[in-house]
């Protein structure tokens, strides 16, 4: 939607559409694949998505910096969103991790030379912090006009801290971390409902969807918290079984 609003001015703007679509297909295929080994095509798709996310972040940063004023609040608010390509990077990274785990033994799997639960937990914690930064920027632009707008900048940071602690500390049962990650998952769905309500309250509401989907709060943004929190729950489960 953002690139459509930008009229696909640069041919590179088609890249995330292709990459995200392929990642979605790869994810559906991987979910149905019962073979316990890495699928090299899926793995390549996920790695390409991560690379596209890195390149997209560079393009968006350039878009911000080339405007008058450079790295100013006005440009951060209204130029290409810096946090958007990172979502593609995270989805690619998590997909690649899932593929790598297929080659690991069921008992004590390893990632990047460390226990899989620790590695995945740290990755998700970093992803949560980055997503919080993007939400904080957008809600600051909206002047936090509704009290609920403070939720995505207060709940997920706690989840990230708890998950990072679980990843780095001695493995054990962590019921409070699990509970907080579930709250963060619910927060993402609740945020999508709030954003849908925000679109409905604009002039013309959903009858004027072709304009309000672009001008209103972004519908796909809040579920990113749900996706990361679910990945965090998987990491926590892995971590609790490690020695």
Placement of each model-derived feature along the sequence:
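Short amphipathic, positively biased membrane-proximal segments
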Residues: 1-243
């Amino acid at each position: 939607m953002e690139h459509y609003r930008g009229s696909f001015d640069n041919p590179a703007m088609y890249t995330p559409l292709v990459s995200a679509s392929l990642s979605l297909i790869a994810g559906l295929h991987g979910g149905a694949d019962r073979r316990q080994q890495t699928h090299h095509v899926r793995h390549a798709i996920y790695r390409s998505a991560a690379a596209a996310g890195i390149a997209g972040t560079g393009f968006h940063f350039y878009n911000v910096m080339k405007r008058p004023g450079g790295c100013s609040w006005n440009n951060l608010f209204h130029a290409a969103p810096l946090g958007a390509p990172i979502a593609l990077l995270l989805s690619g990274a998590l997909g690649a991790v899932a593929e790598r785990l297929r080659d690991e033994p069921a008992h004590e799997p390893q990632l990047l030379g460390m226990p899989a639960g620790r590695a995945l937990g740290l990755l998700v914690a970093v992803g949560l912090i980055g997503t919080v930064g993007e939400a904080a920027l957008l809600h600051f632009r909206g002047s936090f006009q509704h009290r609920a707008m403070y939720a995505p900048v207060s709940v997920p940071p706690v989840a990230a801290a708890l998950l990072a602690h679980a990843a780095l500390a001695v493995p054990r049962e962590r019921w409070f971390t699990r509970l907080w990650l579930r709250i963060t998952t619910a927060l993402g769905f609740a945020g999508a409902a709030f954003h849908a309500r925000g679109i409905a309250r604009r002039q013309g509401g959903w009858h004027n969807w072709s304009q309000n989907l672009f001008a209103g709060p972004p519908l796909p943004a809040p579920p990113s918290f749900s996706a990361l929190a679910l990945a965090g729950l998987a990491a926590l489960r892995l971590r609790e079984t490690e020695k």
